Every structure is written in C-alpha cells, then in structure tokens.
Amino acid sequence: MRHSFSQAARSALALGLFAAGLGLSGAAMAQEPLIFVHGYSGSSSNFDAMVMRFTASGYPRSKLYGFNYNSLMSSDRTSASSLNSFINSVRASNGNQPVSVIAHSNGGLVVRWQRAKLGGEAGMRRFITLGTPHKGTTSAYGCYSPACFDMRPGSSFITQLAGAGCDRSLWSANDGVILPARNAQCGTNVQTASVGHIALLTDTSVYNQVRAQLP
C-alpha cells in the first residue's frame, strides 16, 4: 500500500520549489490523507510534481498516497474494486479519517464508480478530477482495452454511472485528449489555464486550483 512517487523527481522538484519561494505557506491545510489516482497507461509517479508541491507547502509526506492499477488490462469496474480496498486500508491506517482523492483522466472514472457503486462517497471528503472523460472521449476509439471501451462516449460504463459520483472537475479547453473538452465537466466545474492533458499534472496554476478546492 506504500507510495511509489519517484525519489529523484521529489528531490529535484523540491529544490526548485523552495528556490521559487513557496516555502511552507500551506501549513493551515487539512491534514487528512490525500490519494492520487493516475490515468490510462500511467502510474502514481505521474503526480510527482504535484506531490512535491504539497510537501513543500507543508503537507505531511506520510499523508500522501499513490494508487496504482493496471489500466491497460483491467476494466474500470475492476480497478474501482481494487481502489475501494486501497482506500479502506488507508483509512484504517489513519484512524478511519475520511480521505480526499485527486484523479487524472481515466482515474476519475475509476473513482466515480467506487463512490457511486461501492459506497465510497461516505468516506471521502473531497474528490477532484483533472481532465477526466466524464462523458467519454472520442480519442478512446483509437485504443482497444477494457478501460478504453469504458471511456468511449455512450459506453455501458458511462451510461450506468449516469452522472453519479462527481464532485469537483477541473478541465482545460485545450486538453487535446478529452474530446470534446467539455466532456471533462461533471459536478462543480472549474476551468483551468489552456494547458494540455498531461500538463494538468504539472502546471503550477492548476496545482493552486486543486489546493483551493480542498476543504
């Protein structure tokens, strides 16, 4: 259940963040566990930049968790079941505190299923998606795997969700992967700077918007 954010990236980014004067400005943030859920064909190391910004702002490193799942082979339903077990384990290790979850791309669909179909909403204080194909993306017609089928507009997975399980969605008009871009909107929508799909993970202004959405 341990984190798998890359040590090299953490060290390098930390130096840059402190040089930029970010310091420990976020000490007043809630100290609940944060769980990061990657997108299709990704890994928790995709969140290295964001994790370092959290730790540089004073968030305890011990409260940051990365969830990995086999997005190339597993359906989003299967991944949601694994996520449910992971979240229960994290909560048990933290006095049964509620968690907040930050998910990128397809990871947001995995979390929504866990919230809407597996009872996960009760143990989650905040859920933030970054470029998630809530209503599907036409780019998913270019790949062939269970998760790709789930991400297609009008899929049985998206139809069964029927808009449930959303909370806060951050989306970019220049995403380039979620097509059309408005399909990344669900729940309370927050438009980011016009950055690409991957840059949602590393852009400083997007990180600041994520922080602003946390309770």
Regions found by a protein language model. Give the residues of each.
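C-terminal catalytic-base region of ester-bond hydrolases, centering on the histidine
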Residues: 148-215
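A short, Lys/Arg-enriched amphipathic alpha-helix followed by its capping loop at the start of a domain
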Residues: 50-59
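Bacterial N-terminal signal peptides that target proteins for export
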Residues: 2-15
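Residues at alpha-helix caps and immediate loop-helix transition turns in enzyme cores, especially N-
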Residues: 46-47, 78-79, 202, 206
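Boundary at the C-terminal end of the N-terminal hydrophobic targeting segment
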Residues: 28-30
